């Protein structure tokens, strides 16, 4: 922080302290930059507050950072990630890709969901590297590739509430497994102690030694900041896979972290850009949606289409907790994009908006979601995003077979009737109640009131508050592990069972049933908006958040605002 408005920026300085200068030069008065890393081609990846997002579980009081790609030669910049919560610590892997930590909890438990991702430097092929679909570890921070190794990396596993950034030092190898302890090769300094899965929010409270910011010297020796016991100082240590822990630097009244090795290293390969910035869409290809644990046991031919929605994330210092969008409905707005067909052999190909966090739900013939993605995929402009199936193992190779979708042009989205919009109870569900229910549920007599209009101090209508208890759903804090297919089928909801059994001769149309299923599949939300205010504190002072988010997205994300 060197500017009067106390914004963070990334600076470059020579080892002797001379030549101090900003590495990222951008004229926007409200943007901050941190966690910078050099790319092999001279460009820089950094984290920025460019999304005007706040951490939803604390009502946006903490800003969220997403990644940008910056070119010092011409000062051009492009946004790379469109993630719900924070990105941390991007670093170049030995193969030229970028790995980083992503915090996500769209319908997931928010204190077990900081996972390791990897992508190309231009943002393409962004996918999970370690920890997706598992409760352990809660968080993996400070990841660094092991020199000369094709896949292994070191990281710090930690909890969420309680001790949140330092923790246990683990060597990972994703080729051995990508969940829980499957790919954990060794804990330092406990080489002979098996690593056991422990599902606990405050994962490393009372655990010693505590480590933070490891730097590999090779695949066996590491520099790291450590605090060996509750009474020790934070110092710099040389540690190794043989359980040696040697103090290099420690001083009373000081704390040393972030050791950086000064040496000449081999530059990783430079991966050419694959984006086509003249395009507004990405192509998505699924080879066989029945592959993978997501649809395990589902008979072929069951999936008829995919329902797509985009996420609209919480704003800075804006109400966004569990009691905003609905009762146990999640943190984010779900914006309906439309549906696309699935071929008879389970293959799919379609086009959808680029630079947009998209979530997918496979639907059966009745329009019911068989599975929930509970995450998102973001295609870059002109990118072909491909996967083998539904939550398949990332170590699985493509199936050597020709599929129908690969021989066809991509399908266009079939838009929702009325166009793309946020799913809102008043617009989608209330009209069904008005037609079929309020003759009896009119606020008179014993039948509870299902009329719209009246709102309480949180903005909830009487009809929503009376109806949602009859919907069975996982809520906004669902299990990290992949759900069982049909685990939250609408038939498990008392509302649906009552209507199908027969309720005073109430009959819904096919369209109304699909709308009701959609509501249940989205976790029964109420509101489809945020009350984002103009902020009064720096660096956001004076900006209308909703307008500013759109402006920055249009300018730095290829017009995707």
List the predicted regions and their residue ranges.
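Loop/turn-rich, solvent-exposed surfaces of beta-rich toroidal or solenoidal domains
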Residues: 101, 145-238
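Aromatic- and Gly/Pro-enriched helix-to-coil junctions and flexible linker segments
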Residues: 265, 298-303, 312, 353-357, ...
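Multi-bladed beta-propeller domains
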Residues: 15-32, 70-85, 120-139, 176-206, ...
């Amino acid at each position: 922080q060197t500017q009067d408005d106390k914004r963070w920026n990334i600076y470059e300085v020579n080892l002797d302290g001379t030549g101090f200068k900003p590495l990222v030069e951008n004229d926007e008065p409200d943007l901050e930059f941190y966690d910078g890393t050099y790319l092999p081609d001279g460009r820089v990846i950094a984290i920025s507050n460019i999304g005007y997002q706040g951490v939803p579980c604390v009502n946006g009081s903490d800003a969220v950072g997403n990644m940008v790609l910056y070119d010092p030669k011409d000062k051009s910049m492009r946004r790379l990630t469109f993630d719900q919560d924070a990105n941390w610590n991007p670093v170049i892997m030995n193969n030229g890709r970028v790995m980083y930590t992503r915090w996500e909890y769209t319908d997931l438990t928010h204190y077990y969901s900081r996972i390791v991702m990897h992508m190309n430097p231009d943002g393409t092929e962004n996918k999970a590297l370690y920890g997706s679909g598992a409760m352990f570890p809660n968080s993996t921070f400070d990841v660094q590739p092991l020199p000369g190794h094709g896949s292994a990396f070191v990281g710090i596993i930690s909890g969420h509430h309680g001790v949140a950034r330092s923790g246990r030092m683990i060597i990972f190898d994703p080729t051995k497994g990508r969940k829980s302890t499957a790919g954990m090769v060794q804990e330092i300094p406990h080489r002979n102690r098996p690593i056991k899965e422990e599902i606990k929010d405050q994962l490393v409270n009372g655990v010693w030694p505590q480590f933070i910011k490891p730097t590999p010297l090779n695949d066996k020796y590491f520099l790291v900041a450590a605090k060996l016991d509750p009474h020790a100082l934070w110092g710099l240590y040389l540690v190794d896979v043989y359980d040696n822990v040697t103090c290099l630097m420690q001083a009373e009244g000081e704390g040393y972290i972030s050791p950086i090795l000064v040496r000449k290293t081999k530059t990783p390969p430079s991966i050419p850009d694959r984006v086509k910035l003249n395009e507004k869409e990405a192509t998505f290809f699924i080879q066989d949606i029945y592959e993978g644990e997501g649809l395990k046991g589902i008979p072929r031919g069951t999936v008829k289409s995919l329902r797509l929605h985009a996420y609209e994330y919480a704003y800075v210092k804006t109400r966004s907790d569990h009691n905003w969008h609905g009762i146990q409905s999640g943190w984010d707005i779900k914006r309906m994009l439309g549906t696309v067909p699935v071929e008879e052999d389970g293959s799919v190909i379609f086009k959808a908006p680029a630079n947009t966090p998209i979530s997918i739900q496979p639907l059966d013939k009745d329009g019911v979601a068989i599975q929930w993605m509970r995450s998102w995929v973001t295609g870059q402009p002109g990118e072909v995003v491909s996967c083998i199936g539904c939550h398949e193992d990332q170590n699985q190779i493509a199936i050597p077979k020709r599929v129908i979708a690969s021989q066809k042009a991509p399908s266009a989205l079939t838009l929702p009737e009325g166009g793309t919009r946020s799913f809102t109870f008043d617009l989608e569900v209330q009209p069904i109640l008005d037609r079929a229910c309020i003759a009896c549920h009119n606020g008179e007599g014993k039948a509870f009131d299902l009329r719209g209009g009246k709102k309480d101090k949180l903005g909830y209508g009487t009809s929503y508050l009376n109806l949602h208890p009859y919907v069975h759903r996982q809520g906004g804090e669902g299990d990290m592990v992949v759900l069982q297919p049909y685990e939250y089928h609408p038939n498990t909801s008392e509302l649906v069972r009552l209507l199908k059994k027969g309720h005073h001769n109430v009959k819904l149309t096919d369209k109304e049933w699909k709308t009701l299923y959609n509501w249940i599949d989205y976790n029964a939300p109420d509101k489809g908006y945020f009350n984002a205010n103009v902020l009064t504190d720096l660096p956001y002072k004076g900006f209308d958040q909703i307008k500013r988010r759109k402006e920055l997205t249009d300018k730095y994300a290829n017009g995707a605002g």
